[in-house]
Every structure is written in C-alpha cells, then in structure tokens.
Amino acid sequence: MQKGTLLFLSVCALIFFSADKPIRDKAHINWMNLDDVTSILKKEKKPVLIDVYTDWCGWCKVMDSKTYSNKNVADYLQNKFYSVKFNAETKDEINWEGKTYHYNAGYKCNEFALYITQGQLAFPTTVIIPGDGSQPQAIAGYLPTKDFEMIVKYFGEGEYGKIPFEDYQKKFKTSW
C-alpha cells in the first residue's frame, strides 16, 4: 500500500514538473541613451520618451514593473518612440541639442533633468519631446497603463499640436 502511494505521488510529481508551461511574452523596451537618440533623430524623426527616475524612487520601480513591463506598452514604444531612461541624479555630462548639462550640487540632480521637467522635479516623470522637436512635455508621477496609453498615443498618433489634450481625453477609448 505504501509503495503504491509513493509510486502514485512520484508519477504525479513527474507529470507536474515536466508539463509544458506557457511561456509568457516578456515585454522589452529598447532603452537608448541620449547620445544615440541625438544621432538617430538626424535620420528619422520620432517623439522621444524619457523616463526620468532616481535609484531611490519606489514609484519609479513600480512604473518599471507594472507599466513598462506591459507588452502593449513595450510594443507601442518600440514602434512609435525613441525611449530613454534617464537617472536625474547622474553626474555625467549630458549633451543635448548643442547644449551641455552638468550635475547641479544645489539641486542634487543633473541640469538636464531640470530642463526637461521645467524645474518641476518629481519622480518618476515621463517626458515626451514631440517629433517636431518642440518643448519637452513633462508628466509627473506614476502612470498606470491605461493613463500611460492615452498620453503616449496622443503624441505617438500625431494628435499633439492638432487637438487640445482635454478634447482628445474626452474621445479616447483605452484598448490596453
């Protein structure tokens, strides 16, 4: 009796551990650095999405694990944007559009972060620089996927500059 039970449990364990498990598509965003984006923008214009974060920011980590890990988000960003992760506290020298930005000890961040957020530092901040190169548009705080979708599609589908965001927001239907 005991051998039969042991054999049964062994067979069940073998079946359980050898069963094919579905492979979950892993979302992947090709995060670029600013130098690469600068050179590629000369060849092909697209909006630039910059994820402004810090190493200590808890909500930045939530944005990575919930929003940026979503397959729809990753696919859309890959097709419609040049995506950059930017640590606001980097001490590296940043060159963007002919200007050099340095670490600012007074603000404890890089001046580039101050520029693209218009001095409104909050983390995370999603910054979109439209494809026409106009002023950076900063959206502070964590964005769940449904809110993120509306914002990136506003820029990615070319509605920015054509229709006020409030009007776009009223007619937008989420699909992610």
Located regions from the model:
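Flexible coil segments in periplasmic/lumen-exposed cytochrome c-class electron-transfer proteins
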Residues: G161-W176
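Short active-site neighborhood of thiol/selenol oxidoreductases, capturing the structured segment around
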Residues: K43-K61, S83
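Periplasmic/extracellular electron-transfer cofactor-ligation site
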Residues: D55-S69, D132
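Sec-dependent N-terminal signal peptides
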Residues: G4-L14
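A short beta-strand-turn-helix
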Residues: I29-V48, L77
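Thioredoxin-like thiol-disulfide oxidoreductase module
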Residues: K71-A74, Q78-T145, E149-G158, F165
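Bacterial Sec-dependent signal peptides at the C-terminal "C-region" and cleavage site
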Residues: I15-K26
